[in-house]
UniProtKB/Swiss-Prot annotation:
The active site is at residue 137. The lineage of its organism: Bacteria, Pseudomonadati, Pseudomonadota, Gammaproteobacteria, Thiotrichales. It comes from the Bacteria. It is an enzyme of class 3 (hydrolase). One of its GO terms (biological process) is nucleobase-containing small molecule interconversion. Homotrimer. This is dCTP deaminase.
Length: 188
């Protein structure tokens, strides 16, 4: 597997709609103000999070069980800035919709701007032929509230292309997160 360059990312997005909406360059300013950058980088694509969030809460004092997840553990929030409580986390989704080629695997890494503030992003790999909006998990590892900015860069996607197509893709398996649209909670 080799990491793919900006040229490949641009071609696949413009000709095959791999990323929509797609930004061919790096956007660092919006409305004459500096923002956390998003768009195509040398060997990746910096995604934005949309303005819809699910913020983790302990109001119900329940146990977090991935096999039987209680959606009441989250508070829905819509806005330009999400404040994550100390030592807690929030879910969001990308602005961009992805359509991953059959011979490609995508790995997500956090942006240093957030990591240096104690905010960690976690996303499992985007598997071959997975399609949809990516659900993002932000962990606030600090003892203080932390901000996430909607419609600005939050994570970088790295694209790895195999020398051969996989035998069974995510679409072939009928993956449970295929085609997700909004912030998607755990499914078991």
């Amino acid at each position: 597997m080799t990491i793919k360059s900006d040229k490949w990312i641009k071609k696949m997005s413009q000709e095959y709609n791999m990323i929509e909406p797609f930004e061919a360059g790096q956007i660092k300013v919006s409305n004459n103000q500096k923002i956390v950058s998003y768009g195509t980088s040398s060997y990746g694509y910096d995604v934005r999070c949309a303005d819809e969030f699910k913020i983790f809460t302990n109001i119900n004092s329940s146990i977090v069980d991935p096999k039987n997840f209680n959606d009441k553990n989250f508070v829905d929030f819509k806005g330009d800035v999400c404040i994550i409580p100390p030592n807690s986390f929030a879910l969001a989704r990308t602005v961009e919709k992805f359509k991953i080629p059959r011979d490609t695997l995508v790995v997500c890494l956090g942006k240093s701007t957030y990591a240096r503030c104690g905010i960690i992003v976690n996303v499992t790999p985007l598997e071959p032929e997975w399609e949809g909006y990516v659900t993002l998990e932000f962990s606030n590892t600090t003892p203080l509230p932390a901000k996430i900015y909607a419609n600005e860069g939050v994570a970088q996607m790295l694209f790895f292309q195999s020398d051969e197509e996989c035998e069974t893709s995510y679409a072939d398996k009928g993956g449970k997160y295929q085609g997700q649209v909004g912030v998607t909670l755990p499914k078991c």
